[in-house]
Swiss-Prot record:
Glycerol binds at R82, E83, Y134, D243, Q244. The keyword ATP-binding applies. The gene is glpK1. Belongs to the FGGY kinase family. This is Glycerol kinase 1. Homotetramer and homodimer (in equilibrium). InterPro entries: ATPase_NBD (IPR043129), Carb_kinase_FGGY (IPR000577), Carb_kinase_FGGY_CS (IPR018483), FGGY_C (IPR018485), FGGY_N (IPR018484), Glycerol_kin (IPR005999). ADP binds at T12, R16, T265, G308, G409, N413.
Length: 498
């Protein structure tokens, strides 16, 4: 009897493997970082062979650490950095170019050309996404246009495309399976999220041959099994979701109106909107959350560019902190920020402002402002930005949030989580297992093979470590938010456009 489920968590800076038991608890973890490649300013690449090598090595390491055989693993779930684009030769299995990472801005000009052709609204209506270099479509076009011989080989049917999940499955099955799931397909900018198919009009606009594209399947589904030479015997590959969608599933946000926020370098907020795709009027993305039980659920997504990175800035550039956890001690040493607001718009502002020309600002300084006030204001900025995104979600969906579920590094900061609850006016729930991304992938994989019976079965595993109840009067909350919005205004449109 298989006792465990394995999650492969392929992130932007490292590959991890976590093995979970039936209660959703961690049995074993292995992690390996890999190289970031920056060929030019604004360009970011990874070596696809290194992605595969690190991911395979951590899987074998996690099994060895816990003394687990392949026969004891019920299934494998995969969660991955989204949008990152790989094109390879299906005859040799070798990439024709490095993986172009989601952060890479090299295709901004292709996006401008599509805007000039009047495709902004078409893309928005069909894919739920804003026209941006972030997504995979323009990255595929760039590889076909710029790698010698790539377009000819693609047109002959020899080259295939995949996001990172697809690349891992191809390698795990030794080239037998070319597949992705709904959540990853919905981040390519060439997938119609309403009709659930690759979109011919968008493929034509980007000049991408349809033969390159993987088959799209539900997020909880047996896609194939690992080649038996890899782990000693074959294991079903049965769950796939992009990292943020996997975290939404792992946080048990299975009902319409439930939401989670991941506090990492940036912050990612997703709200489950059920079986309807809500079009945003506030600059949020409409995306597929997951496909499970023969139905597709949608989500609204908002991203905050600078979250935990603002605390790293205090530590590394300003040298105000020895380590990030120390920020909590300083922030709680004062009663408030003494009127100081910090807007961390270091690279512009994301949702709902979308101002690339905004820059970081500190306002409200007086002679009485201290280091403690400054650190507290920086922490508070994460909560204010989260409020802005959730408020936009409420306006778009008409759904009032009942509670916010949190994960990621900065969710361990009790001061920040309490302030978040105060500013939102709803409880903030931090679960016992904060590795929710890997957990979500494990749940999707376990459900597909009957390791867990149904969503109710996995929901029983979800346990709250701590709930932060709002404890601020409405007038004070409104006063603080008014100050924040005034500060944001002053940071906007600072950098001159070229």
């Amino acid at each position: 009897m298989a006792k465990y489920v394995m999650a492969l968590d392929q992130g932007t800076t490292s590959s991890r493997c976590i093995i979970f038991n039936e209660r959703g608890l961690i049995v074993s973890v292995a992690q390996r970082e890999f190289k970031q490649i920056y060929p030019k300013g604004g360009w970011v690449e990874h070596d696809p062979m290194e992605i595969w090598a690190t991911q395979f090595s951590v899987a074998t390491e996690a099994m060895a650490k816990a003394n687990i055989e392949a026969s004891e693993i019920a299934s494998i779930g995969i969660t991955n950095q989204r949008e990152t684009t790989i094109v390879w030769d299906k005859r040799t299995g070798l990439p024709v170019y490095n993986a172009i990472v989601w952060q890479c801005r090299r295709t901004a000009q292709i996006c401008d050309e599509l805007k000039e052709k009047g495709l902004t609204e078409t893309i928005r209506n069909k894919t739920g996404l804003v026209l941006d270099a972030y997504f995979s479509g323009t990255k595929i076009k760039w590889i076909l246009d710029n790698v010698a011989g790539a377009r000819e080989e693609a047109e002959k049917g020899n080259l295939i495309f995949g996001t990172v999940d697809t690349w891992l499955i191809w390698n795990l099955t030794k080239g037998k399976v070319h597949v992705t799931d709904y959540s990853n397909a919905s981040r390519t900018m060439i997938y119609n999220i309403h009709e659930l198919k690759w979109d011919d009009e968008l493929l034509e606009a980007l000049d991408i041959p349809k033969s390159m594209l993987p088959e799209v399947k539900p997020s909880s589904y047996v896609y194939g099994e690992t080649n038996s030479t890899l782990f000693g015997s074959s294991i079903p590959i049965a769950g796939v979701a992009g990292d943020q969608q996997a975290a939404l599933f792992g946080q048990m946000c299975h009902q319409e109106g439930t939401a989670k926020s991941t506090y990492g370098t940036g912050c990612f907020l997703l709200m489950n909107t059920g079986e309807k795709a809500v079009k945003s009027e506030n600059g949020l993305l409409t995306t597929i959350a997951f496909g499970i039980d023969d139905k597709v659920e949608y989500a609204l997504e908002g991203s905050i560019f600078i979250g935990g990175a603002a605390i790293q800035w205090l530590r590394d550039e300003l040298r105000m902190l020895k380590d990030s956890p120390e920020s909590e001690r300083y922030a709680t040493a004062v009663e408030d920020t003494n009127g100081v607001y910090m807007v961390p718009a270091f690279v512009g502002l994301g949702a709902p402002y979308w101002d690339p020309y905004a820059r970081g600002a500190i306002v409200g300084l007086t002679r009485g402002a201290t280091k403690e006030h400054f650190i507290r204001a920086t922490l508070e900025s994460l909560a204010y930005q989260t409020y802005d995104v959730l408020n936009a979600m409420r306006e778009d969906s008409g759904i009032d949030l009942k509670a916010l579920r949190v994960d990621g590094g900065a969710s361990a900061n009790d001061f920040l989580m309490q302030f978040q609850a105060d500013i939102l006016g709803v409880p903030v729930q931090r679960p016992e297992v904060i590795e929710t991304t890997a957990l979500g992938a494990a749940y999707l994989a376990g459900l597909a093979v009957g390791y867990w019976k149904d969503k109710k079965d996995v929901a029983q595993n979800w346990a709250i470590s701590k709930t932060f109840e709002p404890d601020m009067i409405k007038e004070r909350r409104e006063e603080l938010l008014e100050g924040w919005h005034e500060a944001v205004k002053r940071s906007m449109n600072w950098e001159k456009s070229e």
